[in-house]
């Protein structure tokens, strides 16, 4: 029997790895599935584990107040050393571009354990954008024995780096697997739908406002490279858009990071509770976020995963970054880059709200990130490696 260890530590990783954990667990006679979490995003991670009913076998619980990337890397590396010695997995699977992924892959390499990289081959070719994610994924890619690329372009990126084609499998993105499972769950469970409506209300937004065609712009922002002036420009643009479109609701679930919240208060003031059509709400669990995203008109974000998820729901995405490691979405027309440029943010949101044809061209474009069957392909591939 093969022992497979899946390691993740942030909410986005957990969302994309959860359906893979469940897929492996369907084959208990062939695979022993071991889950190790680092707790890099403690509270947000635990929410996802609960939604997908995943109980970790190991929890490094690395988070400490005021820690930096040095601390995170060191704690994951040392913690994984001990976990790998005890668990002795045949293969370690990591996801994407987080510090957890890179440090866990390095720890496995030090013990000569093969590494499988989920969401391999994404590249901006600029190690400082996004930072530190671009370097993280390049380092993880150098360590990986198996590379599970979400798209053909990702595979081409790897082959240009002299990665053997035999080690690469194009799978689609596991986030679409997760998204489809969750949307199906919400739409077929009236009690859950009502519960999520209540969650949103307690968080600060009443979805019953969305009647008679009222539109919603959903906003997320948390990237390190946007801290400082970038966030000020983003928030100023959003503030002016709320004034330009008083009939449209703007909802921003705020990340817990103080570097995100500080510029929001600088632009919008200390009291965020009495703004006309701008709603700053607390961070949402994955189920609640998907529920709100499904009801949105436009998504304005600096997130990576949302560039894949939102188009799966037919939502145009404006990306508040200067580069993206998801050029397939740009080529397909499901996303557009606006950076943190005030004028671009205002003009593109305005165009989508004012021009139906422009909106339809983005919302009806085909999502290039797969069919929801990525996890099955990964499990089948690794089973053949016995």
Residue ranges, per PLM feature:
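Nucleotide-activated sugar donor-binding and catalytic core shared by glycosyltransferases
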Residues: 1-252, 258-386
């Amino acid at each position: 029997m093969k022992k497979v260890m899946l390691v993740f530590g942030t909410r986005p990783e957990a969302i994309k790895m959860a359906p893979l954990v469940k897929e492996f667990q369907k084959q208990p006679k062939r695979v022993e599935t071991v889950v190790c979490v680092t707790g890099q995003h403690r509270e947000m991670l635990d929410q996802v584990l609960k939604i997908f009913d995943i109980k970790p076998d190991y929890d490094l619980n690395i988070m400490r107040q005021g820690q930096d990337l040095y601390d995170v890397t060191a704690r994951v590396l040392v913690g994984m050393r001990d976990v790998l010695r005890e668990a002795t997995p045949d293969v370690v699977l990591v996801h994407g571009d987080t510090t957890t992924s890179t440090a866990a892959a390095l720890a496995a390499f030090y013990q000569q354990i093969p590494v499988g990289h989920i969401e391999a081959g994404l590249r901006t070719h600029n190690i400082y954008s996004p930072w530190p994610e671009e370097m993280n994924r390049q380092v993880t890619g150098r360590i990986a024995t198996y590379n599970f690329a979400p798209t053909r372009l990702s595979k081409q990126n790897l082959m240009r780096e002299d990665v053997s084609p035999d080690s690469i499998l194009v799978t689609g993105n596991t986030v679409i697997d997760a998204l489809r499972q969750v949307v199906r769950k919400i739409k077929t469970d009236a009690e859950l739908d009502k519960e999520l409506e209540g969650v949103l209300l307690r968080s600060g937004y009443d979805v019953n406002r969305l009647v008679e065609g009222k539109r919603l712009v959903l906003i997320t922002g948390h990237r390190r490279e946007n801290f400082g002036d970038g966030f000020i420009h983003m928030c100023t643009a959003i503030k002016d858009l709320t004034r330009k479109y008083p009939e449209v609701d703007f909802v921003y679930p705020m990340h817990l990071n103080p570097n995100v919240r500080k510029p929001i208060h600088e632009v919008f003031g200390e009291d965020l509770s009495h703004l006309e059509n701008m709603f700053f709400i607390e961070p949402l669990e994955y189920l609640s976020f998907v529920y709100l995203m499904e009801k949105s008109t436009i998504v304005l974000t600096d997130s990576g995963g949302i560039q894949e998820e939102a188009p799966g729901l037919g939502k145009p995405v404006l990306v508040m970054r200067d580069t993206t490691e998801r050029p397939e979405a740009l080529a397909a027309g499901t996303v557009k880059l606006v950076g943190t440029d005030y004028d671009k943010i205002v003009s593109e949101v305005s165009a989508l709200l004012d021009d139906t044809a422009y909106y339809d061209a983005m919302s009806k474009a085909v999502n290039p990130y797969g069919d929801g069957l990525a996890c099955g392909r990964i499990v089948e591939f690794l089973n053949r490696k016995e």
